[in-house]
C-alpha cells in the first residue's frame, strides 16, 4: 500500500511587493546549447537572468538549493509548450514531501507531454503550468523567502 498522498493547496493572496535580499541558495542550470551553470551562489544578477529566461520560455532546467545540496530545493523546467516546478522538502528523510505546479485540465490524467524536458524525459501534464510570469514569480519568491509563492496553487 502506497503512502503517497496528493492534495491541492488553495491559492492564497498574491504578494504585491516581494521582500528584498536573497536566501543563501545556489543555482544549477542546464540550457540548450549553453554550458551548464554548476552550483553558483545565487545573486541578484543571475536571478534576474533566470527570470528573463523563464519569461521568454527558453528551454532549460534550473535548481535552487542550499549550500550542501542535501536539504530542501526548488526546481523548474521550462520549454516552449509548458513550465513545471517542484519544491522538495526534507529531501531523503522519512517525511520527505514535494509541492509542484499543476494543470487543472489534466489533474485526473496520466498523459505526458509530447516535448521532453532538457534532460530528455517527458513530463506528466498534470504537473505543468502555462503562465511564465507566474512561474517567474514563484522562482523569485522562493529565492527571496525560501517559501512557496502564495499566489499560485
PLM feature segments, named:
Residues 66-83:
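Short, structured protein-protein interaction patches enriched in aromatics and acidic/basic residues
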Residues 58-63:
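Short, hydrophobic/aromatic-rich segments at coil-to-beta transitions
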Amino acid at each position: 500500500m502506497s503512502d503517497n498522498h496528493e492534495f491541492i493547496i488553495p491559492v492564497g493572496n498574491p504578494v504585491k511587493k516581494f521582500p528584498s535580499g536573497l536566501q543563501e541558495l545556489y543555482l544549477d542550470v542546464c540550457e540548450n546549447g549553453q554550458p551548464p551553470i554548476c552550483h553558483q551562489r545565487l545573486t541578484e544578477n543571475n536571478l534576474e537572468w533566470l527570470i528573463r529566461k523563464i519569461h521568454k520560455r527558453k528551454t532549460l532546467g534550473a535548481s535552487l538549493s542550499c549550500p550542501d545540496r542535501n536539504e530542501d530545493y526548488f526546481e523548474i523546467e521550462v520549454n516552449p509548450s509548458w513550465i513545471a516546478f517542484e519544491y522538495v522538502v526534507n529531501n531523503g528523510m522519512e517525511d520527505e514531501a514535494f509541492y509542484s505546479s499543476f494543470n487543472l485540465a489534466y489533474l485526473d490524467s496520466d498523459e505526458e507531454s509530447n516535448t521532453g524536458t532538457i534532460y530528455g524525459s517527458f513530463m506528466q501534464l498534470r504537473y505543468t503550468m502555462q503562465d511564465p510570469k507566474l512561474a517567474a514569480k514563484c522562482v523569485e519568491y522562493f529565492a527571496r523567502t525560501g517559501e512557496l509563492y502564495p499566489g499560485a496553487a
